[in-house]
Amino acid sequence: MKQYKILLIIADGLGDRPVSKLNGLTPLEAANKPAISDLLKNSMIGLMDPISPGVIPGSDTSHLSIFGLDPHVYYRGRGAFEALGAGATLKHGDVAFRGNFATVNNDLVVVDRRAGRKLEEGEELVKELNEKIKEINDVKIRFYKGTEHRVAVVLSGKGISDKVSDTDPHYEGLKVLESKPLEDSTEALRTAEIINILTRKVFDVLNSSEVNKRRIEQGEKPANIVLLRGAAHYIKLPSFSSYTKLKAAAVSATALIKGICRELGMNVVTPVGATGGIDTDYNAKAKAAIELLKENDFVFLHIKATDAASHDGLVEEKVKAIERIDKVVGTIVDNVGRDNLILMFTGDHATPVEVKEHSGDPVPILLYVPYPIINDNARDFNEKEARKGSLRIRGLDVTNILLNYSNRAEKYGA
């Protein structure tokens, strides 16, 4: 029996709700999608709950689920994945945080949680922090530049814990929070104290940085604090190949996703021009996926632009991003051949563009197979049509479904 290559395309934050600016259509409805529509002739569509109905997923927990790992078992916080994706090498016992370069006033009240989001000087600032803050109370500190305004911070040493609260207040106009222990332990208390010392040291370094003086002169907001959240102890995950028997690769420019995929043992490629934002080079990602499909059984293609547009409330940009993803689908199918490929297209969660945050809504999902199936005869691929389709699954079902339809699944039982 022929075994087919598998391509999983995730448009981050794809799911949406009717949008007033689109006369009640969702962005997926409004987008022109000729390549995706052409696949409907031999596809099943439906809805996926990344975690379970009504649960609002993080991008971390949803991707673990989609890759077949129950987040209730394997999730320990986002910080470690962000750090791995930003290039950190972690060892057992390290505690990692995800964070934002942000703007605060002299009273440490947050003015901009993302320092304008587009932070071209991030590498310079990370270098300066690493040169001037090496350790606190015998615990080594290391900073890693993430995507756009994001940064990861890793603590290495004895007697530290991930059971500490965030310093990120999550809203502008509020003061940077003091980290507090979340359990009654010496390790948690010690770690919270280290984080609070770190917050002040980071502010002192960044507030006097020549980089930020230059930004102010140019009329930009200074990136003068790092807001921390998502503390996580590093734990080793099983490799994707160990439970799927697939040789796997991924295309992504987003630190979190790269970190998860690397930890799962996938070959992760970030092509030149891929940014993890709205301005990403879609064609470069398509070409990378085409090349990886030559040598791998499974290729995961992640595109962040849809989520970035949603978080910023940019309706037209989300529609354009979906249309550009459609061109990616067409380019890959034309080059690889529709007879050689199982293709799944979905989102990792919904980010309604008028809400600007993740939601617990189910996400539309499409599964194309190159041989005769009982297809859904769908007229279009969108949230409304998906409700009429045959698929009603959880994220945890995705990997098994792909293995089944690619003729790679093993029998369960005698």
From Swiss-Prot:
Similarity comment: Belongs to the BPG-independent phosphoglycerate mutase family. A-PGAM subfamily.
EC number: 5.4.2.12
InterPro entries hit by this protein: Alkaline_phosphatase_core_sf, ApgAM_prokaryotes, Metalloenzyme, Pglycerate_mutase_ApgM, Pglycerate_mutase_ApgM_sf
Pfam families: Metalloenzyme, PhosphMutase
Gene Ontology process terms (BP): glycolytic process
Pathway note: Carbohydrate degradation; glycolysis; pyruvate from D-glyceraldehyde 3-phosphate: step 3/5
Gene3D superfamilies documented for this protein: Alkaline Phosphatase, subunit A (3.40.720.10), Metalloenzyme domain (3.30.70.2130)
Reaction equation(s) it catalyzes: (2R)-2-phosphoglycerate = (2R)-3-phosphoglycerate
Name of the protein described by the UniProt record: 2,3-bisphosphoglycerate-independent phosphoglycerate mutase
Function, in words: Catalyzes the interconversion of 2-phosphoglycerate and 3-phosphoglycerate.
Alphabetized GO MF terms: metal ion binding; phosphoglycerate mutase activity
Keywords: Glycolysis, Isomerase
